[in-house]
Amino acid sequence: CSCDIPCSCNFGRPERTCHGSRLIQIREGQFEGDSLAGINFVVTFYMGRWTRIYIDDALGDTEIVTLDRLMPVAFGGFARLAQVQVRVPLTVSETSDTFRFSVPESTVEMKLFPGLDGSPITITGLPSRSYHDYVQYESVVHTHRSGEADWSYSGTNGFKSEMRVSG
């Protein structure tokens, strides 16, 4: 996102304008009897004002229908503010210390933000079920260009985490 490291929003205390792009990769789970495994999408946002949802165009029709039903339940904030929800090419790549994802209007590349001994910085106990196994990264590239906004950041907050829900 556009925030300093670490982002105060992740601690439940947003302090200023936050522009961001978040990759959501659902690896396992079910919703109303349908599998969620393999559903991927990117949400680019201007926090509290708007979102743009980019759905992986590799998803099949069944996955799209399931995601459409899931979106207002599990990702209601993103869905309510969505200016656009569109299927697009989505690329993801990862090495031992970098992570990159891209859709036509938004690109994020991050590198691990090392601790004192060079190992990854992990944070536990954050106030959201979206932040399990939180690992701190730093943006190398964070760009977005659309009719709604144009930004480019580097050296700002980045992270990877796991969302765990049931019910």
What role is predicted for each listed range?
Residues 1-29:
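N-terminal ordered "arm"
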Residues 88-94:
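Short, exposed beta-strand/loop patches in secreted or surface proteins that constitute
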Residues 19-21, 50, 98:
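Broad gene-expression machinery/nucleic-acid interaction feature
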